[in-house]
């Protein structure tokens, strides 16, 4: 299915079902969000590049308007919905619009062993980073997005995950990524603990 979608380029990767708070202050995006609110339509969140945007993005629906400021600025919360691929960009408005094609995952499920490993590693990373523990829904068909969206991972890696059309591939990629970053995290925590204990690193 294809559609014409207004785009909001950001230095972020939005996943399906992920919540994202936004502060809208630029006139062109105040106009865009105003139209989306009036028409109850989604917009596309795409990762901004130097002179362009990423080819793969995620549509976003406005879930809540937290505050409308007197100068027209907005504080909103959006939720990721469907992934899309940009087919062409339209520059007729003050903000970008794009012809997009939505896509879903290919059939297939995660291996239970990959899920168990990913959830265990994720919990350790959250603990090392001092984050709040949460219980992921291991029956979620796109569990990889839930796990990746809860951590401040490398944006290039998140962008790669967003474009993969296999949940199994994403989960395997997550396990490999978690295993790669954990040694440095463990060392960093030990250094901090040692410094806090005796005043020396």
Spans of model-derived segments:
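N-terminal low-complexity, acidic/polar interaction/targeting segments
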Residues: 1-201
């Amino acid at each position: 299915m294809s559609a014409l979608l207004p785009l909001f380029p950001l230095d972020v990767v939005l996943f399906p079902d992920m919540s994202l708070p936004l502060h809208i202050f630029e006139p062109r995006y105040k106009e865009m969000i105003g139209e989306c609110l009036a028409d109850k339509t989604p917009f596309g969140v795409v990762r901004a590049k130097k002179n362009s945007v990423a080819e793969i993005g995620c549509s976003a629906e406005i879930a809540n308007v937290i505050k409308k400021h007197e100068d027209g600025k907005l504080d909103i919360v959006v939720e990721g919905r469907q992934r899309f691929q940009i087919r062409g960009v339209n520059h007729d408005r003050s903000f970008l619009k794009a012809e997009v094609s939505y896509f879903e995952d290919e059939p297939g499920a995660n291996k239970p062993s990959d899920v168990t490993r990913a959830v265990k590693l994720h919990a350790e990373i959250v603990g090392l980073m001092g984050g709040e523990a949460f219980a992921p829904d291991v029956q979620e068909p796109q569990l990889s997005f839930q796990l990746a969206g809860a951590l401040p991972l490398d944006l290039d890696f998140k962008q790669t995950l967003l474009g993969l059309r296999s949940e199994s591939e994403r989960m395997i990629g997550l396990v490999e990524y978690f295993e790669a970053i954990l040694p440095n995290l463990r060392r960093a925590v030990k250094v901090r603990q040692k410094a806090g204990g005796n005043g020396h690193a």
